[in-house]
């Protein structure tokens, strides 16, 4: 095999690896997709399912995290653990919950830190409380890439009121 073919194969191999490897932006978007999926509730769920979802949500939050939610449902939340506890309380009272993130904008503040803004919508229904509705908020978040496992996690989250629908 001549040198030109060998160099061509090497370049093609490097390009393929770089193309198949998920970018950091894609990995951060996946964190939001996972949060949306784990927050979703489509009816009654057992304790095992609820616990698994709580554990999956906790995995998305850095060990030391802060939250500013200023919300009538999720309030007095200062840490990731408190956030998961509050979310599980709300999930226990709701029949259906859907949370989605749109218009996600990511700005990297270094190799291991990213600032993210997004629009978040929440739809819910609780027959026990006689409540149902939709809400939209703006989310400002800082995500940090863990040094041990290279996973992106929420370090700081701030929800701002935008529009009630």
Question: PLM features: what roles do these ranges have?
Answer:
Residues 4-21:
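Hydrophobic membrane-insertion alpha-helices, especially the h-region
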